[in-house]
């Protein structure tokens, strides 16, 4: 198959870009009173407004043509059919099956996976309910008060983000903690205030060989046994989420306390699976299933909506427009909701691990940019950190703004202030401020003319900075499921158009392999000369400091 740059629509977009690049969105809004209606989509109570983008109707039509030429519709259908889209690992890509609330058969190698998915969901329900009601007791007969999830990457970021986002729905009697970093400080500080008699550990690793997770898991096990000197007590305080029953048993966890998932679930897409057990423990299985239902709602939208009204397709195409034609290298995710504090970190992994690729699915080097750097903070914190660069920096950074119309905690005028900032920032990024407008603002200041001109220049905002806005009634489990699925399918859309495999992560392997070699060289005082001069020098200096 040809690469993206060989597609006719790509060449058309290259020419079209020359006419769009000089235009300002101020003028686009002035010229088109129906711009908001033309460039916004409603899905349930969620509004996706993409009118503040450097696009015209012709731009959108040509981007959709690009998606069609890249075979996006066929790839969407192939994913939902269970075809092996992860070509390097020869695996299906079926996180959509995990939230398939229609129970429509989805087959891998001819076998319907839905009975197994539902069986694990039933086990999650029974287990989480028994812990939450106090029926499941620790080895000394006390109810569980703290759950410690030990995982990394997709076994940590997704569940941690969702637990934080759904904190208003959490059972206050059951506290959730997350340990990911192999830095011992992470584990030590989490464990310090905990009572082993009332602590449940969830060790989450697909292979049960992940170095960081297993190191933390073994240390947690040792901490527990130092305080409760009874190996049999492990069965009441440790459960596993894995695909590797033998390794779970070797670790000392009863395989009956293992929750399975499958190799067609990528780690960064796994929060919908048993990896989401900490979510079910925190907010209950009913809420977890509402999360699944929200994601399934978006899955059906992605699968069936025409591209011109398909939110994740439009999100992906807009990203292509800025990355490959405007030269953008980053994308900001800016939730005006403190409960979504961890969403940018989750999407950072989901996007950058998926689309940070330089070869296509046939192994050929790509000659165009692919995945951007994803970053963000909640509003209004980000306004006092990096928005200066967004407004007046030399780099173009497309932004997503997310906000709920209703707060979980109505408190004086807090929420109106928050939303006024959400709205003002998107307007300011679009409109900017001309130098003439800046001169008028400072005209009353008694300064020499040259100082006034310099100050006016400093107060000029170029504007024309693209943003998408997501506005919804309230951040509840259903809405959160929708938001996450929208971004997942945006990533899929871009991967298809770039003709890359969004579902492997070979880039994480080389450093891990080298770390094993270096780990064996760190003990003792023997000189190390097997690496480059810099690495050898760093190892020597590390040894000298110990």
From Swiss-Prot:
It catalyses: alpha-D-glucose 6-phosphate = beta-D-fructose 6-phosphate. Keywords: Cytoplasm, Gluconeogenesis, Glycolysis, Isomerase. GO terms for biological process: gluconeogenesis; glucose 6-phosphate metabolic process; glycolytic process. It comes from the Bacteria. SUPFAM superfamilies: SIS domain. Its EC number is 5.3.1.9. The active site is at residues 353, 384, 512. GO terms for molecular function: carbohydrate derivative binding; glucose-6-phosphate isomerase activity; monosaccharide binding. Gene3D superfamilies: 1.10.1390.10, Glucose-6-phosphate isomerase like protein, domain 1 (3.40.50.10490). One of its GO terms (cellular component) is cytosol. It is found in: Cytoplasm. Signal peptide: none annotated. Pathway: Carbohydrate biosynthesis; gluconeogenesis; Carbohydrate degradation; glycolysis; D-glyceraldehyde 3-phosphate and glycerone phosphate from D-glucose: step 2/4. Its main location: cytoplasm. Belongs to the GPI family. Catalyzes the reversible isomerization of glucose-6-phosphate to fructose-6-phosphate. NCBIfam families: PRK00179.1. This is Glucose-6-phosphate isomerase.
């Amino acid at each position: 198959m040809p690469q993206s740059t060989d597609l006719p629509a790509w060449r058309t977009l290259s020419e079209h870009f020359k006419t769009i690049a000089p235009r300002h969105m101020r003028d686009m809004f002035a010229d088109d009173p129906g711009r908001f209606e033309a460039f916004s989509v409603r899905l349930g109570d969620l509004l996706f407004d993409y009118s503040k983008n450097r696009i015209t109707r012709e731009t959108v039509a040509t981007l959709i043509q690009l998606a069609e030429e890249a075979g996006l519709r066929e790839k969407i259908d192939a994913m939902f059919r269970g075809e092996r889209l992860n070509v390097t690992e020869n695996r299906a890509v079926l996180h959509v099956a995990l939230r398939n609330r229609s129970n429509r058969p989805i087959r891998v190698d001819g076998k319907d996976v839905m009975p197994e998915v539902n069986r694990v969901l039933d086990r999650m329900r029974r287990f989480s309910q028994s812990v939450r009601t106090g029926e499941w007791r620790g080895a000394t007969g006390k109810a569980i008060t703290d759950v410690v999830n030990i995982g990394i990457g997709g076994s940590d970021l997704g569940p941690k983000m969702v637990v934080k986002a759904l904190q208003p729905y959490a059972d206050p009697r059951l506290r959730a903690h997350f340990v990911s970093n192999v830095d011992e400080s992470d584990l030590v500080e989490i464990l310090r205030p905990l009572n082993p008699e009332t602590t449940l550990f969830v060790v989450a690793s697909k292979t049960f060989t992940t170095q960081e997770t297993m190191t933390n898991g073994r240390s947690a096990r040792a901490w527990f046994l130092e305080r409760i000197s009874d190996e049999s007590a492990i069965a009441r305080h440790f459960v596993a989420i894995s695909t590797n029953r033998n390794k779970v048993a070797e670790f000392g966890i009863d395989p009956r306390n293992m929750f399975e998932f499958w190799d067609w679930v990528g780690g960064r897409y796994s929060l919908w699976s048993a990896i989401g057990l900490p979510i079910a423990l925190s907010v209950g299985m009913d809420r977890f299933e509402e999360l699944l239902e929200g994601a399934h709602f978006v899955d059906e939208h992605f699968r069936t909506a025409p591209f011109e009204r398909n939110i994740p397709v439009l999100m992906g195409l807009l990203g292509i427009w800025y990355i490959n034609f405007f030269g953008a290298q980053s994308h900001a995710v800016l939730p005006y909701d403190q409960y979504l504090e961890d969403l940018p970190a989750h999407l950072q992994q989901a996007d950058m691990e998926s689309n940070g690729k330089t070869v296509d699915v046939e192994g050929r080097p790509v000659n165009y940019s692919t995945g951007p750097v994803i970053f963000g903070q909640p509003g209004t914190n980000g306004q006092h950190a990096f928005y200066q660069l967004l407004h007046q920096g030399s780099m173009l950074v497309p932004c997503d703004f997310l906000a709920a119309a209703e707060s979980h905690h109505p408190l004086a005028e807090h929420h109106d202030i928050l939303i006024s900032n959400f709205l003002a920032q998107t307007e300011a990024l679009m409109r900017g401020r001309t130098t003439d407008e800046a001169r008028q603002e400072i005209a009353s200041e008694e300064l020499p003319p040259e100082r006034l001109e310099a100050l006016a220049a400093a107060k000029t905002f170029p504007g024309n900075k693209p943003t998408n806005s997501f506005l919804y009634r309230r951040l509840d489990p259903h809405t959160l499921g929708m938001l996450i699925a929208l971004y997942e399918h945006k990533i899929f859309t871009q991967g298809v158009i770039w003709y890359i495999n969004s579902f492997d992560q070979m880039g994480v392997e080389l450093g891990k392999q080298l770390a094993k070699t270096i780990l064996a060289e760190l003990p003792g005082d023997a000189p190390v000369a097997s690496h480059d001069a810099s690495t050898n020098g760093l190892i020597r200096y590390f040894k000298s400091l110990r």
